Amino acid sequence: METIPALRPFVQQPTVRLTTYRRDGRPVGTAVSIAVDGRRAYVRTFESAGKFKRIRHNPLVEVAPSTLRGEATGPAIRARVRVLAGDEAERARRLIVRKHPLLHGVLVPLGHRLTGKKTVHLELTPLEGADGRSDTRERAAA
């Protein structure tokens, strides 16, 4: 499946800054690993993570290429998050493990098991047309 333009910057990107929003609207950015498949991107976290709690309250997020520390290195796109279950979650897990075999094939699952944390898989769907950019000035310049 061909990758849509909004997600192309993330295909080779190992880490992105996922910005979620507190109830009062303040943004919180977190570095997460990402995998892209066509029209969707996938990330994982654990069920008790702050970002997951914020996503359950507000599924609108921003995603930007970033360093491993979560410092944005490119423009953000807006996206809607959906929590996956069953076969969809398994498919997302496989895509993430394929892109990040050591980190998400061994280390993250081991860490979640040792701490008793439940892993959740999330699907990100870009908003705002083909480019998904969050800043109208960025869209005008493109």
Annotate each PLM feature.
Residues 1-17, 71-73, 136-142:
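Extreme N-terminal tail/first-helix region
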Residues 2-5, 28-30, 48-50, 108-109:
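A generic local structural motif
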Residues 7-11, 16-20, 36-40, 51-58, ...:
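Short linear motifs at secondary-structure transitions and domain/linker junctions
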Residues 13-47, 61-65, 74-77:
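Short beta-strand segments
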Residues 31, 88, 136-138:
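Generic signature of intrinsically disordered, low-complexity, basic-rich segments
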Residues 42, 87, 130-132:
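Residue-level signal for secondary-structure boundary sites
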Residues 48-128:
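Short, structured beta-strand-loop surface elements
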Residues 125, 129-140:
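Short, charged, intrinsically disordered terminal tails
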